[in-house]
UniProtKB/Swiss-Prot annotation:
Basic and acidic residues: compositionally biased ranges: 290-303
Lineage: Eukaryota, Metazoa, Chordata, Craniata, Vertebrata
Chief location: nucleus
Gene Ontology BP, a term: epidermal growth factor receptor signaling pathway
Name of the molecule in the record: Homeobox protein DBX2
One Pfam family per UniProt: Homeodomain
Gene name of this polypeptide: DBX2
């Protein structure tokens, strides 16, 4: 058999072994079932000019040709050489799980395969492909090699880590009664004072509306209270005292305004009797048309005021008072005669 024919048969054998191994292997990230890559970079490479394969130069000397053919000839192994899919570069995620970005096939010798897999014989054909086993200590979701980084040229997002969606055990517990009680410790409860304490506090408040720090400390020690309780009591008491003072001032103003706007008849109802009704009938006389006829004109009023003569209104008032005094004297005489 010629050396070229032997080399051709050997190359065909290696192609069959590699294709059979690839058919049994799961598809690598970015590769289809037929072993073709659908990544953008690989598609661009395929669409461009194919890279020429390096072929050894044709030997002109028959001796050199036999030497090269003998060097290319290798003994065929009894079992196919196993292939291993391993990541060429790994990236460590925040959670500690490796992300494989680049994948490459490594040809392992039967001795290395048997050394790594002591439980199986090197001639076992089922062991043609043995992927690297994930670490048992890491979670399952994080130990499996994610294909998101290699897919679509690395544009796909990586799966969310365990910290983004925590498990039920890591979630914070709901608010309980203990947490509520701890949160409410800072809120001061309303103090309940006894009668003696109230009397002592009220007595001190009547002396001074604003208590000093030393007096407050002494008063708290004597009454068995805290300084904060005494301070808050004085603040509330001063607020009540201010409100009561404001109410008193407003009530006094209202009484004064009502007193100024009272009618003469309401004065008699309040205890101011009017024995002479003619005095209060004077405004009615002013409104009568007869009084308007008898009343002088404004020019005549000015003349009377300049001359010093009393106005007719004063004369009418004096006459009414004189009549009232005569009536009172007559009523008194009648009462004395009856007695």
């Amino acid at each position: 058999m010629l050396p070229s024919a032997v080399a051709a048969h050997a190359g065909a054998y290696w192609d069959v072994v590699a294709s059979s191994a690839l058919l049994n292997l799961p598809a690598a990230p970015g590769f289809g079932n037929l072993g073709k890559s659908f990544l953008i970079e690989n598609l661009l490479r395929v669409g461009g000019a194919p890279t020429p394969r390096l072929q050894p130069p044709a030997p002109h000397d028959p001796a050199t040709a036999l030497a090269t053919a003998g060097a290319q000839l290798r003994p065929l192994p009894a079992s196919p050489v196993p292939l291993k899919l391993c990541p060429a570069a790994e990236q460590v995620s925040p959670a500690g799980a490796p992300y494989g970005t680049r994948w490459a096939f490594q040809v392992l010798s039967p001795s290395a395969d048997s050394a790594r897999l002591p439980g199986r014989a090197p001639g076992d054909r089922d062991c043609t492909f043995q992927p690297s086993a994930p670490a048992p200590s890491k979670p399952f979701l994080l130990s499996t090699p994610p294909f998101y980084s290699a897919c679509c040229g690395g544009s796909c997002r990586r799966p969310a880590s365990s910290t983004a969606f925590p498990r039920e055990e890591s979630m914070l517990p709901l608010l309980t009664q203990d947490s509520n009680s701890k949160a409410r410790r800072g809120i001061l409860r309303r103090a309940v004072f006894s009668e003696d304490q109230r009397k002592a506090l009220e007595k001190m408040f009547q002396k001074q509306k604003y208590i000093s720090k030393t007096d407050r400390k002494k008063l708290a020690i004597n009454l068995g209270l805290k300084e904060s309780q005494v301070k808050i009591w004085f603040q509330n008491r001063r607020m009540k005292w201010r409100n009561s003072k404001e109410k008193e001032v407003l009530s006094n103003r209202c009484i004064q305004e009502v007193g100024l706007q009272e009618d003469p008849l309401s004065r008699s109802a309040l205890g101011f009797p009017s024995p002479c009704p003619s005095i209060w009938d004077v405004p009615q006389q002013h409104s009568s048309p007869r009084w308007r006829e008898n009343s002088p004109e404004p020019s005549e009023r000015l003349i009377q005021e300049s001359s010093g003569a009393p106005p007719p209104e004063a004369n009418s008032l004096q006459g009414a008072l004189y009549l009232c005094s005569e009536e009172e004297a007559g009523s008194k005489g009648v009462l004395t005669g009856a007695v």
